[in-house]
A protein has these predicted regions:
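Catalytic active-site module of serine/aspartate enzymes centered on a nucleophile-bearing elbow/loop
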Residues: 254-295
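Alpha/beta-hydrolase
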Residues: 140-142, 148-227, 246
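Conserved hydrolase catalytic core segment
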Residues: 91-134
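Conserved loop-alpha-helix segment in the C-terminal half of the alpha/beta-hydrolase fold
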Residues: 212, 219-262
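Active-site loop/oxyanion-hole signature of alpha/beta-hydrolase fold enzymes
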Residues: 57-100, 276
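N-terminal cap/lid segment of alpha/beta-hydrolase-fold proteins
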Residues: 1-13
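Flexible "cap/lid" loop of the alpha/beta hydrolase fold
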Residues: 118-158
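Conserved HGGG/HGGXW glycine-rich cap/lid loop of the alpha/beta-hydrolase fold
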Residues: 12-66, 70
C-alpha cells in the first residue's frame, strides 16, 4: 500500500507519498516552482521495481501554504530537500527532477555534494537567462493574435485575466504538453498549484520571468556534477534540445535522450519509451556500482 504523510520543514509541513518497495529509491522533484506532484504521477510506473517518492514542495498541493513570500527562494527549497531526505532516511538515492525540480536538484548537488547514485533531469535548464531567451524565441512563433494578447496584457499588468491565460495555453499546448485532452494529473497540478510561489520566483509566465530566480545560472559549474546523469527532454520542449545538449557536453558521465514529437512533459507523450529509458539507465548505474536489486 502507498505510504503518505507530512514532514516538518522550515515554514510548515510538506506532504509526501511513497509507492513501491525495495531497491534504491527514486525521489522525484516537481516543477513550477509551485506546480505540485500530481503531474508526476506517471513516474509511479517505476515503482514495480523500486520505491518511488513524490512530495509537494511547501506552498502548493497538499503541503502547507504559508503567507510569508520571503520563503520562496532557491536556498529555501534546497534546505527543504535536505530535510525531506533526512526525514525519510534516504541514505542511497536516485534523484529525479522535472523542469524547476531539476534546477533544484542541481543546486542541491552543487551546494552540498551529497551522496547520490544518479541524477535524472527532465526538461531542466541550467540557465534561466538562456531559458528566457529561448522561450521568447518560441513565443515569437505563436499566432499573431496570441502574441498581441500577451503583449497588451503584459504592458497593462493584467496577466491574471482569462484572455491572457488563454493565450498562454496556446504556448503550453505546443511546448509543455501536446496531448489533447491534457492528462488528469496535469489538470490537477494546474488546479492545486501554488501560484504565489510561481509568481514570486518566476513571474507571470514561462517567457516573462521577473521573479527572484530570473538570473539563476549554474552553467559554469556543471562540470562539478560527478554523479551519473541522464538528461531527458522532448523535440518541442520549452527547455530546448540545444540547451540540454550543451548541458550534456559539460556534465561528465552524462547521457542524453530527446524524444521525437514530444515536449516538456515527454513522460506523458512517450510514456512507455520514457520509463524504459529511465529503468535502463538506473539498472546500468546500479550494475556498475555493484548494487543488487534488493539493496
Amino acid at each position: 500500500m502507498p505510504e503518505e504523510g507530512f514532514i516538518a520543514v522550515a515554514g510548515g509541513r510538506v506532504w509526501y507519498r511513497s509507492v513501491g518497495e525495495g531497491g534504491v529509491p527514486v525521489l522525484c522533484l516537481h516543477g513550477g516552482p509551485g506546480f505540485t506532484h500530481n503531474y508526476l504521477e506517471p513516474l509511479e510506473d517505476l515503482a514495480d521495481r523500486r520505491r518511488v517518492i513524490l512530495y509537494d514542495q511547501l506552498g502548493c498541493g497538499r503541503s502547507d501554504r504559508p503567507s510569508d513570500t520571503s520563503l520562496w527562494t532557491v536556498p529555501h527549497f534546497v534546505e527543504e530537500l535536505v530535510t525531506v531526505r533526512d526525514a525519510l532516511g534516504l541514505d542511497r538515492l536516485h534523484l529525479f527532477g522535472s523542469s524547476w525540480g531539476g534546477m533544484l536538484a542541481m543546486q542541491y548537488l552543487l551546494d552540498h555534494q551529497p551522496p547520490l547514485e544518479s541524477l535524472i533531469l527532465c526538461g531542466s535548464p541550467a540557465s534561466m537567462p538562456r531559458w528566457i531567451k529561448e522561450c521568447n524565441e518560441l513565443r515569437a512563433q505563436l499566432p499573431p493574435g496570441d502574441q498581441e494578447i500577451l503583449d497588451r496584457h503584459e504592458a497593462a499588468g493584467w496577466t491574471a485575466c482569462p484572455e491572457y491565460q488563454g493565450a498562454l495555453v496556446t504556448f503550453y499546448r505546443r511546448h509543455v504538453c501536446r496531448m489533447d485532452p491534457w492528462p488528469a494529473g496535469l489538470e490537477r497540478s494546474f488546479t492545486e498549484a501554488g501560484y504565489d510561489v510561481y509568481h514570486t520566483m518566476n513571474g507571470p509566465s514561462e517567457f516573462t520571468v521577473t521573479g527572484n530566480f530570473k538570473d539563476w545560472d549554474v552553467t559554469d559549474r556543471l562540470g562539478e556534477i560527478r554523479v551519473p546523469t541522464l538528461i531527458l527532454g522532448g523535440e518541442h520542449d520549452e527547455a530546448r534540445p540545444s540547451h540540454m545538449r550543451d548541458m550534456h557536453e559539460r556534465i561528465p558521465n552524462s547521457e542524453m535522450v530527446v524524444f521525437e514529437d514530444a515536449s516538456h512533459l515527454c513522460f506523458y507523450e512517450k510514456r512507455e519509451e520514457f520509463m524504459a529509458r529511465v529503468n535502463d539507465f538506473i539498472d546500468g548505474v546500479e550494475a556498475r556500482a555493484g548494487i543488487s536489486r534488493n539493496s
